Amino acid sequence: MDQMINWSNEEQKLIINNTAEKLRLSNAIIEKDYWVCFVLDYLFSKFKYKDYIYFKGGTSLSKVHNLIYRFSEDVDIALDWTILGFTKKEPYFNRSKRQQELFNKKINILTSEFISEKCLPFLNLDFTDLLGDNFELYIDPLDS
C-alpha cells in the first residue's frame, strides 16, 4: 500500500489498468477501492486516534468474506465515546425520552467538535506528508 503511493503517476495508472483488465472492472472502481484501502490502512495503523475508532464494516466487510461482489463507496467508522469523556456504560444508562434526546444532542456536538478540532488537523498534516501534496479534508457544512 505504502509502496504504490510513491510510484510515478504512470506506474500507478499501469497497475490500475492491469488490475481493472484482469478483474474486468473499470479503472475508476479499482482506483476508488485502492483509496478506500489506503484510508483504512492509515486510520487503523498510523492515525493518532486509531485506538478510539472502530471499523463498522458494511460493504467492505461483506466483500472481505465474499458475501457480495461490489466495491465500497464509503468507509463506516465509529468513535469510542470514552475519548469524549463518557464512561463505557454511560450511553446505556436508563433515561427519560427527553433526557435521551438531550444526551444524544450533547454527544453529537462533542463528536463533531472532536472530529473538526482534533482529528481533521492530524488527518490534513498526515495526508499532506504521505501524499507529498497540500491536502485538505473538511466537513461539508451541508452534511449533517
Residue ranges of model-derived segments:
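Compositionally biased terminal segments of proteins
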Residues: 1-144
